[in-house]
From Swiss-Prot:
E.C. numbers: 5.1.3.2
Catalytically driven reaction(s): UDP-alpha-D-glucose = UDP-alpha-D-galactose
Protein name per its UniProtKB record: UDP-glucose 4-epimerase
Catalytic EC class: isomerase
Gene that encodes it: galE
Native source organism of the sequence: Erwinia amylovora
């Protein structure tokens, strides 16, 4: 039996594929490479000495999905594929709903046809909405999302909840991520977005290496200690390990369950800049810009439930996040191309 990883060539997906291969799982990857490179999978295979089956295709292509499910005996799906930029989603809402919601519906329908009933969903802390008290806990009401991206994740969680209620054989876990950062400790894998990065740390790293001129910090007038946004950052390898823990826990649950995966503390944008400067030994040029639509002032996780039920907790802190990011970026100044 194989694990199907959608979006498996992407940042979080490729690190999770590496962890799956390292422990001996058979892995099938489906990715349209819209924000990823085949090279990331080549590097996973080189680091592990193992191979994964790769399909280049889109979730909206039913024939592609059917060929995947007919060619392989899939036991579970880890679903990363989707668009993920909060700001872009406010400008392109239909594109986000089409990819993130409709794409997931097509995937679930093809899973049903193939008799696959185990599903891990890459959700987001943005489902908690603008007015949720911090730290976020799983019992916090979800909704009140501030971007089409967050709403698309919220909608998929509701679809999963309803489908699990209607189909007793279906078991699904939604993992609500906070902000993934860092890279594999080898320096051979990391975040390499196509075009200008949407996330903070790869942008900082590309400024430090000279690929970008300066960092734009969106807002310094938030009600935080230094005025910049505060986020819960989680090392990507801790996040990958969380997916394996969730996968192993599926058999113990009934229906639908959600877990926060975060560090349980927040850092401001300026704190992240200073920590990266410490790790790299250089300076990161930045300028303050207006706030972005949909961004929140501050949030972080309460990941107690994942600790208790999944036996998962972070083991890497901000120093490891910055060290591994700089190691990756300095070894690969042009990314993994």
């Amino acid at each position: 039996m194989s694990i199907l990883v959608t979006g498996g060539a992407g940042y979080i997906g490729s690190h999770t594929v590496l962890s799956l291969l390292q422990r001996g799982d058979d892995v099938v990857i489906l990715d349209n490479l819209s924000n990823a490179s085949r090279e990331s999978i080549n590097r996973v295979e080189k680091l592990t000495g193992k191979t994964a089956t790769f399909f280049e295709g889109d979730l909206l292509d039913r024939s592609c999905l059917r060929s995947v499910f007919s060619a392989h005996r899939i036991s579970a799906v880890i679903h990363f594929a989707g668009l993920k930029a909060v700001g872009a989603s406010t400008r392109k809402p239909l594109e986000y709903y089409q990819n993130n919601v409709t794409g997931t519906l097509v995937l679930l329908e093809e899973m049903r046809s193939a008799g696959v009933n185990q599903f891990i969903f890459s959700s987001s802390a943005t489902v908690y909405g603008a007015d949720a008290p911090v730290p976020y806990v799983e019992t916090t009401p979800i909704g009140g999302t501030t971007s089409p991206y967050g709403t698309s994740k919220l909608m998929v969680e509701q679809i999963l909840r309803d489908y699990a209620k209607a189909n007793p054989e279906f078991k699904t876990i939604a993992l609500r991520y906070f902000n993934p950062v860092g890279a594999h400790e080898s320096g051979q894998m990391g975040e390499d977005p196509n075009g200008i990065p949407n996330n903070l740390l790869p942008y900082i790293a590309q400024v430090a290496i000279g690929r970008l001129e300066k960092l734009g910090i969106f807002g310094d007038d938030y009600p935080t200690e230094d005025g910049t946004g505060v986020r819960d950052y989680i090392h990507v390898m801790d996040l990958a390990e969380g997916h394996l823990k969730a996968l192993d826990h599926l058999s113990a649950i009934e229906g639908y369950k959600a877990y926060n995966l975060g560090a349980g503390k927040g850092y401001s944008v300026l704190e992240m800049v200073k920590a990266f400067e410490k790790a790299s030994g250089g300076t990161v040029a930045y300028q303050i810009s207006p706030r972005r639509d949909g961004d929140l002032a501050a949030f972080w996780a309460d990941a107690t439930l994942a600790d208790k039920e999944l036996n998962w907790r972070v083991s890497r802190g901000i120093d490891e996040m910055m060290r591994d990011t700089w190691n990756w970026q300095s070894q690969n100044p042009q990314g993994d191309s």
